[in-house]
Amino acid sequence: MKTAAELRQLVTRIDHRSYPAYKDTKGMYQFPGYLLSIDHVQGDPFASPSRVSIQVKGKIAGFPEQLYQTKWQKTALEDALIRQFGQCCEKFGFKAKGSGKSGMISISRCGQEVLERSAAQIDEKTGDIHIRLEVGFPANGRTINAREWIRIFFEFLPECVEKALYYKNCDAKRLQKISDLAEDQQALRDILPKLGLCAFVANGSILPRESGVSARPMKSAVCFQSPEEMEVEITLPHRGVIRGMGIRKGITLIVGGGYHGKSTLLKALELGVYNHIAGDGREYVITDSTAVKLRAEDGRSIKKTDISMFINDLPNGKDTTHFYTEDASGSTSQAANVVEAMEAKAGVMLIDEDTSATNFMIRDELMQRVIHRDMEPITPFIERIRELYEEEGISTVIVAGSSGAYFHIADCIVQMDRYMPKDITQTAKKEAEQFPQLSGPKEKAKKPDFARKPQQGREWKGNDRIKMKTLGKEAISINRETIDLRYVEQITDSEQVTALGYCVKYAQRHLLDGTRTLQEVVAMLEKKIEKESLAALCESTSSVASLARPRTQEIFACFDRYRGLKL
């Protein structure tokens, strides 16, 4: 291992040379208080920035063990360190001058959710901190600018390390509050099933967001207040007693007029699978961590999914136990989404009437009279929803504004009235008695077959040059094959999409051999991440990308939408 002084001498020696000479700097260097590793050097000042990592020994960093002794506290502290380091990076970003991306210093940009990321890792045994960031190596045109490079690595980065990664220079009370909040959120998440709940929304929560492009809380928004009938009281380790609306397991219907807050509540519930930072307004909006938001998804591909519990006897004679299409309709796509959520072991399904296929959700009495059941291949969701709960233990939360069909079967009916919830179960049930209940299914559905066994694609055999590109939160391109993730609505960060791409790449290279089911493949990916870290998906220390951990359910969703998957 070389010293910082040797690195300075090396860069001074290659000053004014052609830009590729920067590649000589690749390696590890001991700086006072930390280890610097230059993992990947960009080939051009206009290319993606160089990848750099910093390691600080636990004894030097000095963060108390109680701040990272549990998994969720560790993730919360890592998130806080990324935010602190990022603030320092912003202070120095582009202060070093030059062409292209010269002087750029960046680290993962965290949102309102607290996610496990490759940008910061703490060793729970030693307290060692590992930070990954990107730096644009300075250039004049396409020649090396050593003076500006030295400013970045010998002035700017040492100050960032000292201010953000040494406990003695951090706000100790703030970090303790972050740790306590993480512990409270996990305690609340753990207690939900014991209370028979699938979700909880604390009184005083701020659910509306600032705008369609901002996830920050809306100013002057109406604070959430639970209906008295649904209010539960929970004691947390640090916050103490907290009260709010408990959504019980079973079938919950959210109704109300337009613009009264139905979809806003559902949106908060769908993102309640993640913990949120202090001040977000949704810190204590907690949902079963396996909950999945479902919708119709016209045009998506379906790969040998067993949708026979909803769709049978198609006029074209297609086998719905191994249904395949490259262009699904609204109803078939939503049927597949439900079955795939079951395959991913979802405990709760979240559905909004606005984004659902009507013929999949309901079939009214008049339509049943005109078009006989024997002529309709679709068994609507309303006829399976009770069975899903009683046989599979899957709860459902549905938002409806135009159809009262679900009044008959809902266990709880909540009306949103000017952003405030009301329990109208008894009133709605009484009114529903005046309307005939639609007939149920002829027989119980056969449990879907989850025996799909993906194989390695031909183009992956012996090919180490597969290219991948993340397209924001909406899609990822692998070997020119685009995986469309626009409607996987619980993806909250583009770095999760990048991680999903690496999941596919790793699986294609090591796991897809035609002998393992998709469930087994995903379980093996999860085990690798849990045991070795998120960065292990990249398989090379020189190519660790900025990754955020997706849930199991999103990993399944990515494979399900991968048109290049061979089954």
Give the ranges of each region predicted by the language model.
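N-terminal accessory targeting/assembly segments
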Residues: 1-196, 207, 567
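Flexible beta-alpha connector loops of hexameric P-loop NTPases
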Residues: 145, 300, 310-331, 363-378
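Carboxylate/His-rich catalytic cores and anion/metal-binding grooves
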Residues: 193-197, 203, 259, 266-297, ...
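N-terminal pre-Walker A segment at the start of P-loop NTPase domains
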Residues: 208-243, 278, 286-302, 307-318
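Glycine-rich phosphate-binding P-loop
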Residues: 242-274
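Conserved alpha-helical scaffold flanking the Walker A/P-loop in AAA+ ATPase domains
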Residues: 329-341
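Conserved P-loop NTPase nucleotide-binding/switch module
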Residues: 341-385, 389-390, 402-408, 412-429
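Conserved NTP phosphate-binding and transfer environment spanning the P-loop NTPase/kinase superfamily
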Residues: 390-393, 399-567
